[in-house]
Amino acid sequence: MASRNIWCVRRNFLFDLRGWMLQYSAEVFLKSISFRTFSVECDSKDKESLEEEREDLLSNLVTMGVDIDMARRRQPGVFNKAVTNEQELKIFLLSKGASDKVIGSIISRYPRAITRTPESLSKRWDLWRKIMASDLEIVNILERSPESFFRSNNNLNLENNIKFLCSVGLTHKCLCRLLTNAPRTFSNSLNLNKQMVEFLQETGMSLGHNDPRDFVRKIISKNPSILIQSTKRVKTNIEFLQSTFNLNKQDLLLLICGPGARILDLSNDCTKKNYTNIRERLLSLGCSEEEVQRFVLSYLNMVFLSEKKFNDKIDCLIEEKISASQIIENPRILDSSINTLKTRIRELSHAGYDLSTSSIALLSWSQRRYEAKLKRLCG
């Protein structure tokens, strides 16, 4: 009898426990449904709010003359930002003298500009003004290269770069050239600029230059873009010049402090490919190895000419009975476009000027000087 009572007590307890658990589970389940419904409602409201903000952003950008398709292609992530400052950016740039058209162009090409705060922009502008003479000069740089100003909002890094470049002896004029022609220099990390400067100083010393700081100034003044290249690229180009032209240290030093500085930042593959083409083309015309090297060293800008451009210009001159030896003695004529060469050759021929026996240097003269000469020839 006692055992049956105990069994009944256990059974009632278990039924009560199961009922309590079912009730508790139902409450939890209903609460979770209620919470989920609330969450969905919140997500829906947030989504609607975000969509409204995006519509406002697009409307603002269209009103500002921004090319939306271009901006999306370049930096699509900007359109997903929760906060943007396009109106503040417009007001800021207008206050600096930028036109509506320029502002639209800047944002179209570098949309991330609208994520910068007015405070950050103002600080960065003040730092640039320490180098540039006027707001308009900065606006012109932004119009040409918006990335240079808006790429980074690390104003401390910019300030440190300016201090460092001044410390290695760069003049205010040189800093202006850097900011105008290679503004990305100031967006580099400070360590990156230090690495290049240290590399150039070591290179100058290894070639016998007695003032490493002066060597750095000369290279940067000749080639402002060098600080945005890798030390590996510059080193490879220096080695190429030395080995290709069999230069001793003194001659190599003179070359890279002068005309050779301009090709130090050229792609290594491009340098070798273009030189190989020049060499093979001139050898095919009967020039000697010595003449080829003299030709290139006398005007290293030749290395910037692509294979097609160089060959087309040579063909144009050869077709007009101008000899390879004349070209070797006047490398600067290859600076002129093919259209200019053809036009001048035709005009000189009509004026009775025989290019096959006379100087061809006037093919590379300035337009004003050339026209004065042509007028005298025509009498």
Curated annotation (Swiss-Prot):
This is Transcription termination factor 1b, mitochondrial. Disruption phenotype: Double knockout of Mterf1a and Mterf1b results in viable animals with no gross phenotype, and normal oxidative phosphorylation capacity. Steady-state mitochondrial DNA levels are normal. There are subtle effects on levels of mitochondrial transcripts: transcripts initiated at the light strand promoter and also situated downstream of the MTERF binding site are increased, levels of 7S RNA are reduced, while levels of other mitochondrial transcripts appear normal. The keyword Phosphoprotein applies. Phosphoprotein with mostly four phosphate groups. While the DNA-binding activity is unaffected by the phosphorylation state, only the phosphorylated form of the protein is active for termination activity. Functioning seems to be regulated by phosphorylation. GO terms for molecular function: double-stranded DNA binding; sequence-specific DNA binding. GO terms for cellular component: mitochondrion. Keywords: DNA-binding, Mitochondrion, Phosphoprotein, Repeat, Transcription, Transcription regulation, Transcription termination, Transit peptide. It is found in: Mitochondrion. One of its GO terms (biological process) is DNA-templated transcription termination. Monomer. Its main location: mitochondrion. The record marks R144, R184, R332 as: Interaction with DNA. It comes from Mus musculus. Transcription termination factor. Binds to a 28 bp region within the tRNA(Leu(uur)) gene at a position immediately adjacent to and downstream of the 16S rRNA gene; this region comprises a tridecamer sequence critical for directing accurate termination. Binds DNA along the major grove and promotes DNA bending and partial unwinding. Promotes base flipping. Transcription termination activity appears to be polarized with highest specificity for transcripts initiated on the light strand. Residues 1-37 form a transit peptide. Belongs to the mTERF family. Expressed strongly in the heart and at lower levels in brain, liver and kidney.
